Amino acid sequence: MRKKHFNMILKLALISSLLALAASRTHLTDCLDDHKYCVGLPRGCVGTECNFAFSSISNGTHTEIEIFGNSVIDKTWLAIGYSADKKMEDDFVVFCIRDDAGTNMNKLDQMAGLAYNGKHSNEMTGTIENIKKNKNDKFGLDLEMKEYEKDEQTLYCKMAHRVEPIIDRFNVSKVEILMAKGTWMKGGLSYHGNTRNNTGIIDLSGESKHKRKNSAVGSLALVSSAITFLAAKMLF
């Protein structure tokens, strides 16, 4: 009887894991929307095949972002940074963490947060939970966790935040994006080292991407250009 019960638990766990993976794959490959931007590493990857993937869709006041990573073990953070240029100084950082022992899956506000990067040194604003508790969202990004999924070595996070603070800070709506990964240490972000990449520019204003002809070839080209819009190396 115990063996049957144990096998049933294993089956349910496997089904849950597969459903989570399928959900992430659906989200991350939904890049045909004229307003949605997607990038991934390595070049040519799609969805959960990527080592690192990011998407953004904006309505002009808020943007919804997705961050996905493979080979993500315990005590790891994934992040994207918004910057006015490729130097990646004076930029906003939105991060998502995997801390199996230090976080509670029932409290999603522990899983993500904000930091501010000066000259390549992160100043922690805090997790969403701490920001709300301490009322220290000084830039008014109003970050919110929408979905959080983790598997044996994968991490998927969907978040939303206001875009006005970023646009006002840089005085532009089109900003450079950095994707990075590092070790979560003592409640903070360790330096990412070489595990980073400048992936291009996104428009936070919510304006449509350049429209192509309404054809199967055009649609496939749009997916290809959206997913592979990046240029350099990222080491994992």
From Swiss-Prot:
One of its GO terms (cellular component) is extracellular region. Residues 1-24 form the signal peptide. It comes from Caenorhabditis elegans. Glycans are attached at residues 59, 171, 197. It comes from the Eukaryota. It is found in: Secreted. Keywords: Glycoprotein, Secreted, Signal. This is Uncharacterized protein C44B7.5. The keyword Phosphoprotein does not apply.
